[in-house]
């Protein structure tokens, strides 16, 4: 984008300099790459290109293929199998239509239990056994397992209780809702999250609007309320916020950590926090 100082995008080329895909992003590298056992970044780029041509989400596609592999339908690291799956999807075959239903429904149909989804949406690169604030955000958000609603990948969780983790998740979710509402750069949020006055001043200078930092923060709070109300009206409940059981039962190498986050406890902590803050 002209004038952008961060320049987060990239162009991935082959050994002749021909563009394969642009951009190749972190989540795609994880879910379509290491998650599926790929070691050659060129293979990841070509799978990314296929996902783009299909118009499917690379996170969901990578998680779906990995579940198929984990269930014994293919071998980890087998890029030919991955291309076979996407070829079936592109052809619209019965298998392809099945694969296109996504991670949750493929796992259910195979009666497979290690399916990393929340509200039937695939979890991205952030394992809730280790990155707990992001795990809470993905549990509570109306948007399914969406890491962008309140990601705190570097937050030190080990010495925090659930209430403290929920408090950080709420703070991040409000900031993310503000950024999404105003179209603020996710990488610039290390500045804007901590300085709502800067945003208010910029808006006021441009539009003579007279908004305050509290007004901007309240937009984030109201966005979260509206999203939650929508999901409640659609029939979602507390049980839909649970992590998949294997996160609670299987230790994550090499740390050996298991998830300690349960929907009832997390929801109660969030409710208490919002009441205490009069939100």
Residue ranges, per PLM feature:
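Extended C-terminal regions of large enzymes
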Residues: 1-279
């Amino acid at each position: 984008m002209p004038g952008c100082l961060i320049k987060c995008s990239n162009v991935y080329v082959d050994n002749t300099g021909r563009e394969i895909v642009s951009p190749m992003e972190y989540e795609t590298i994880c879910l379509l790459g290491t998650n599926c056992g790929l070691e050659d970044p060129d293979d990841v780029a070509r799978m990314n290109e296929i996902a783009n041509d299909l118009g499917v989400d690379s996170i969901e596609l990578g998680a779906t293929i990995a579940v198929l592999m984990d269930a014994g339908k293919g071998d980890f690291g087998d890029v030919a199998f991955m291309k076979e799956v996407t070829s079936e999807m592109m052809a619209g075959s019965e298998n392809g239509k099945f694969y296109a239903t996504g991670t949750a429904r493929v796992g259910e149909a195979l009666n497979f239990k290690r399916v990393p989804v929340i509200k039937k949406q695939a979890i991205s690169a952030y394992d809730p056994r280790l990155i707990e604030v992001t795990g809470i955000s993905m549990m509570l958000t109306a948007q399914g397992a969406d890491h962008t609603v309140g990601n705190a990948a570097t937050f030190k969780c080990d010495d925090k209780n659930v209430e403290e983790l929920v408090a950080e998740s709420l703070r991040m979710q409000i900031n993310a809702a503000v950024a999404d509402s105003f179209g603020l750069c996710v990488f610039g949020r290390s500045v804007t999250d901590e300085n709502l006055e800067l945003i208010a001043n910029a808006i006021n200078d441009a539009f003579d609007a007279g908004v305050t930092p509290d007004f901007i923060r309240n937009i984030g709070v109201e966005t979260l309320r509206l999203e939650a109300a929508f999901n409640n009206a659609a029939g979602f409940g507390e049980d839909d916020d649970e992590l998949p059981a294997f996160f609670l039962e299987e230790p994550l190498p090499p740390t050996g950590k298991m998830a300690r986050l349960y929907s009832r406890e997390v929801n109660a902590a969030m409710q208490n926090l919002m009441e205490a803050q009069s939100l």
